[in-house]
Amino acid sequence: MSSPGGLHSAHLSSSASRSEAVANAANAAAAAAAAASGSPHWQQQIVKAEISRQSNSPHHHARAAALAARSATSSAIAIQDPSKGIVTPQVAANGLFVAKKDSSAANGGGADDGKGSGADTAPATTNGAAPISSTSAKDKQTWSTIDMGGLALKNIANEVYRYSFLTSLFINHNALTTLSSDIVKLRHLTVLDASGNKLSSVPPELGMLTSLRELFLFDNNLATLPPELGTLHQLEMLGVEGNPLQDNLRSLLQREGTTAVIAYLRDSCPVPLPPPEREWIMIDPDLPDLDADKHANDATQESFNVLSYNILFDRYATAQMYGYTPSWALAWDYRKEFILQEVMSYSADICCLQEVGVEQYEDYFLHHLSQQDYEGVFYPKSRARTMRDDERRRVDGCAIFYKSNKYQLIEKQLVEFNQIALQRPDFKKSEDMYNRVMTKDNIAVIALLENKLSGSRIVVANVHTHWDPAFRDVKLVQVAMLMDEVEKAGARFAKLPPKPSVAEGYPPPPKYTHANQIPTIICGDFNSVPETGVYDFLANGAVPGDHEDFMDHVYGNYTAQGLQHSYKLESSYVPIGELPFTNYTPGYEGAIDYIFYTKNTLSVTGVLGEIDKQYLSKVVGFPNAHFPSDHICIMSEFNVKRSDRGSSSTTAREVHHPTSSSNASSMPRR
């Protein structure tokens, strides 16, 4: 049989086999070792190795599949994985049809916020993007397996590595002495069989193939394994019997199996060089020309910067979720110092953190950041309401830190989405609200800040929406409720009289009559890519009630009339394009964290750039030794646009805020 691109030989030649005496000696030694250790793990090695040795004929796997299919009534021919006897879904390069394997469960969505799976199974793609369907058969890949086994090949053609969609590659029982590092391009491989060759080493790039479930390297000349293979966190079977493997690896495999070997390699892997510092990208402010000329050298021109960072809550950072991360790099004692150092190094005026534990906030971050002139506002998720104090300290939430030498906190507010939903009359008849929104305990935190020198004001909202891509309707509802609360808070803030006095050299403090006249920041982990309804709603100010992200669920006026807000918002990264990702794991990478700002009151003047691409080419995901969370921080700098200033008032104002349905609390002026 021939395959596309001339990958297979047109004729079937017999492969050169190993010496019978060598094979028998290896089998006898392995059997003796297994018997001596009584290890089920090594017994499994022997069984799999024997199956591999019986698969040394040309195109063995493809021929076995064809033979098995002759008696089947279906026209599909399933190539079988000989190691399991289980149908491997695909179509081989030699033209054999096979069933398609679904690996979505392995790759999943962005790891975040509880890391569980939702009860609702509505189709959705990672982090809330609407599912994409293809109606064209020619757009669908019809094969994903290549069987090049038993052909006495000395080299693999480079064209093979162009087929990045491959999920199974059989290059067993050839005469290969090396594997090309280009194999890193086959990121979707779940099965790789390179048994029965002459390999004395395997490339460290194999560690980038994090979807691998089975890696067969039986009967080669391997004395050791590269520690980079420690990132193969989904590997179920590492076949190395028949190799002169060093004693420590062999004994570990005998005693504890594949998982233990991978963990050992992962934790002993040398730490690579850190990446270059992320570039700070300057952006020309969009101030009108006359205004820009007037204030070009004005020392009273106000600017501030905002940092947003999901720091990965300690209780979510488990070895099960982040099996590719060294245990020492996943430990909170290591990560917390790295996070604190990173936040302090950027020295942002306003820092918005998500997934901050109560204990971490009270005992660590507040303590250290207060020494850098920060004060903080923090609320845990709604579940903390009903917990004992010791349990409550193990709940995460959202925190806003601000420079206390620059800003005064006027009001802080907790936004509990499930509690707000209870108070809306139009939601009371919605089963979807009770079944989908009320069961999620996500929150947002709002802080109303006033500049101590100029009297100008800022509304800051820090949010962490639900993570599950199957609940993108819930994310949209949560953000809609957040914008409702931001507008209410802004309206209260606008009613307050201006600051009684300002610093010398500053113009009179601004007077605000409407909420949208106050500079406003909406930032956080939205768990939504730019193509979703959440981003569309924030950036455009409205989405229709029949938007696809509602998924035909009913949410009172939200779906009856559509969503809208009165702010002119834009993501701060729009001038350069959203970052390639803010969440980076083997199963998902994409932009889901944003800093939105009001364009009529603020100009973005700079943003923190992306991570070095060369560094990323050798990294399977975060967290790792250099990045302590599965998210990266984002940061932007803003200029406050000048507005008409009223005359300063000498009358001291009385600070009073009406009670909000979402737990607003006011702070007296100092």
UniProtKB/Swiss-Prot annotation:
UniProt keyword terms in alphabetical order: Activator, Cytoplasm, Exonuclease, Hydrolase, Leucine-rich repeat, Magnesium, Metal-binding, Nuclease, Nucleus, Repeat, Repressor, RNA-binding, Transcription, Transcription regulation
The LRR repeat ranges on this chain: 165-186, 188-209, 211-232, 234-253
InterPro entries membership: CCR4/nocturin_mRNA_transcr, Endo/exonu/phosph_ase_sf, Endo/exonuclease/phosphatase, Leu-rich_rpt, Leu-rich_rpt_typical-subtyp, LRR_dom_sf
Residues binding Mg(2+), per UniProt: E355
Low complexity bias locations: 9-39
Keyword Ligase: no
Keyword flag Transcription regulation: yes
General function of this protein: Acts as a catalytic component of the CCR4-NOT core complex, which in the nucleus seems to be a general transcription factor, and in the cytoplasm the major mRNA deadenylase involved in mRNA turnover. Ccr4 has 3'-5' RNase activity with a strong preference for polyadenylated substrates and also low exonuclease activity towards single-stranded DNA.
Protein name from the UniProt record: CCR4-Not complex 3'-5'-exoribonuclease subunit Ccr4
Organism whose genome encodes this protein: Mycosarcoma maydis
Lineage, opening ranks: Eukaryota, Fungi, Dikarya, Basidiomycota, Ustilaginomycotina
